[in-house]
């Protein structure tokens, strides 16, 4: 299906893997937006030909959305975002919720957009608020017990249902958590909730589900359902489904003269519809028809035959998407099974799942991994993704790396992602450190002079200049700089400049051919490979990060080289290479064991290199001063 996506074709060397943040847009959507601006850019319900075109478009759009959702007994409200639609809904429901001090149940594993509005109302009106929390059984699990680990996280339906009582006014559910990716059985949950209290209203956030699964608001018997089309090949327009029998108690939050209106659109659809984005939905309809044709939909084997956009077609489309994306899940499942250094935050029981993978690494900060993936052509993302409550609950400080896929991703792309993720491993070996002085006194003039062209490091107060690059070192005679990588360290490792993005200019590409530089790189790789081989680990290291740093002083005052003190850098192995020393004293490298007891000290001289196991050892460097 990539042929329909201009962006995918333009950036064919990139892998789009941040689709849960927003999908790419097919040409049919773009063409319909263009068509609207040329032929229908007007107000609806008028007598002009342009206005009539728009009115007809809006009727067709409503028919399309109703078919997509199987809406038979409700109304669709349009808005710019689900966040805004839910906020509006909460205000419209406020008086209904506070009658008899109604109780509200909210999940702690959903996007914040469907949580904060109702939490705010509960606090304002002193309503009882219950939290349905993800079960975290990690403390009860043994690290080496894979059977237990499969139940590390659990979405327990019984826990939710036990919270429902005769005074429960509202339950909010994510159809899919945008972190976990697991699909909740919405139909079952709504049925069970209403068995316990038929008056309880249920709001479902379908934003993360819509791109992957069939929506059926009628079958669910849901009261409210929200989704966003920009997550499913559309523009930034969102919808709120309201079941018909919920319209009587919703209050007007719009202009005062709509107070007595029976039209719920006028009460809740503030500012009307964004006609540009709404009209583009007809392009999404065209794209989905082409999708069905691609898979030989039974009514479209004759390409000249018109295809009706009906529920049968919608069911066919989503069956193909779900089956195709299930293979993505199997591929990622194999990755996790075979790599103990990676954890996917998900429920690993029998729950179905969409291709959203929130990943943690044993030895790497997710933000650093994300920056590297982006430079390698994989568009992923990292952070909390507005699931801060879940992150706090699980004590995940810096968020997760999120890989989120769509039906236009290929199996080759998924395999490439998995191959790259496997670079980020933690090596538990007994190696501590090694010093090398083979190149002592023979650093090339070219390499020495390159230090004078570095830019000032604005992140440190001392006199420091720096360059920084991600290098492809697969061929030592053809080392390449990859992209323009920003540098990031967690505050777990750097208490001075942690948790911030630092921008440095790439090192000079000319030194990549320098014999001394290549020697340093090759010696570093040889040392690591030898130590890994001793531990029966065979790995081919393809990428390294290189910092080129010059620190100088022009006074008798000491300059602190390492303001963060005794520390680790957050990698498997590091190498410190001395290019030259000139008229300074100090800069003594200290190496410490895991208890931070000093085990070795040395003053690196020109051409010397220290290789250190950063998983086991700590290090610091003493200040310098003029000699």
Q: Can you say where each PLM-predicted feature lies in the sequence?
A:
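Catalytic core of non-heme Fe(II) oxygenases with the double-stranded beta-helix
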Residues: 538-540, 544-603
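Conserved hydrophobic/aromatic beta-strand scaffold that supports enzyme active sites
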Residues: 239-241, 356-358, 470, 565, ...
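Catalytic core of Fe(II)/2-oxoglutarate
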Residues: 587-627
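Fe(II)/2-oxoglutarate oxygenase catalytic core
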Residues: 429-546, 555-558, 598-603, 622-623
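Secondary-structure boundary elements
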Residues: 165-167, 195-197, 524-540, 580-585
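Pyridoxal 5′-phosphate
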Residues: 1-139, 147-429
């Amino acid at each position: 299906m990539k042929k329909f996506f201009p962006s995918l074709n333009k950036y064919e060397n990139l892998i789009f893997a941040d689709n849960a943040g927003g999908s790419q847009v097919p040409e049919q959507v773009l063409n319909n937006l263009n068509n609207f601006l040329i032929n229908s850019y007007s107000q609806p319900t008028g007598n002009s030909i342009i206005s009539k075109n728009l009115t007809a478009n809006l009727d067709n759009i409503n028919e399309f959305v109703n078919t997509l959702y199987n809406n038979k007994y409700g109304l669709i409200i349009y808005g710019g975002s689900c966040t805004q639609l839910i906020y509006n809904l909460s205000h419209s429901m406020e008086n209904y919720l506070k009658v008899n001090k109604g109780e509200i149940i909210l999940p702690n594993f959903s996007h914040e957009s469907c949580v904060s509005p109702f939490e705010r109302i509960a606090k304002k009106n002193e309503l009882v608020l219950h939290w349905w929390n993800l079960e975290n059984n990690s403390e009860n699990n043994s690290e080496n017990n894979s059977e237990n680990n499969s139940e590390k996280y659990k979405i327990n339906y019984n826990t939710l249902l036990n919270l429902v009582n005769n005074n429960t006014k509202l339950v909010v559910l994510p159809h899919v958590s945008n972190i976990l990716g697991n699909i909740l059985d919405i139909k079952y949950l709504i049925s069970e909730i209403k068995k316990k209290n038929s008056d309880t209203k249920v709001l479902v956030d379908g934003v993360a589900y819509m791109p992957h699964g069939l929506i059926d608001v009628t079958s669910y018997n849901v009261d409210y359902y929200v989704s966003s089309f920009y997550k499913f090949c559309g523009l930034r327009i969102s919808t709120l489904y309201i079941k018909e029998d919920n319209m009587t108690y919703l209050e007007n939050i719009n202009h005062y003269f709509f107070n007595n209106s029976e039209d719920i659109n006028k009460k809740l659809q503030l500012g009307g519809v964004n006609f540009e984005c709404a009209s583009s939905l007809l392009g999404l309809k065209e794209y989905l028809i082409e999708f069905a044709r691609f898979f030989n939909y039974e009514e479209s084997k004759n390409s000249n035959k018109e295809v009706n956009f009906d529920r049968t077609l919608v069911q066919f489309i989503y069956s193909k998407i779900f089956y195709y994306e299930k293979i993505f899940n199997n591929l990622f499942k194999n990755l996790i099974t075979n790599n103990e250094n990676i954890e996917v935050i998900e429920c690993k029981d029998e729950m179905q799942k969409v291709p959203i993978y929130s990943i943690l690494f044993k030895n790497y900060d997710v933000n650093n991994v994300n920056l590297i993936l982006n430079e390698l052509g994989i568009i992923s993302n990292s952070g909390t993704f507005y699931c801060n409550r879940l992150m706090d609950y699980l004590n995940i400080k810096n968020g997760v790396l999120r890989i989120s896929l769509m039906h236009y991703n290929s199996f080759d792309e998924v395999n490439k992602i998995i191959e790259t993720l496997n670079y980020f491993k933690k090596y538990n070996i007994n190696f501590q450190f090694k010093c090398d002085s083979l190149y002592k006194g023979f650093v090339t003039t070219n390499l020495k002079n390159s230090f004078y062209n570095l830019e000032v490091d604005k992140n440190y107060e001392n006199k420091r200049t720096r360059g920084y690059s991600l290098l492809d070192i697969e061929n030592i005679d053809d080392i390449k700089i990859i992209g323009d990588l920003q540098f990031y360290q967690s505050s777990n490792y750097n208490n001075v400049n942690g948790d911030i993005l630092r921008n440095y200019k790439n090192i000079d590409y000319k030194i990549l051919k320098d014999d001394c530089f290549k020697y340093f790189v090759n010696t570093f790789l040889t040392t690591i490979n030898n130590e890994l081989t001793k531990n029966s680990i065979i790995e081919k290291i393809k990428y390294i990060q290189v910092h080129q740093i010059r620190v100088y002083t022009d006074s008798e005052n000491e300059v602190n080289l390492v303001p963060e003190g005794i520390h680790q850098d957050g990698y498997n192995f590091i190498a410190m290479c001395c290019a030259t020393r000139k008229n300074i004293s100090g800069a003594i490298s200290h190496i410490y064991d895991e208890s931070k007891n000093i085990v070795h000290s040395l003053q690196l001289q020109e051409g010397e290199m220290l290789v250190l196991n950063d998983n086991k050892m700590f290090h610091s460097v003493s200040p310098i001063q003029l000699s």
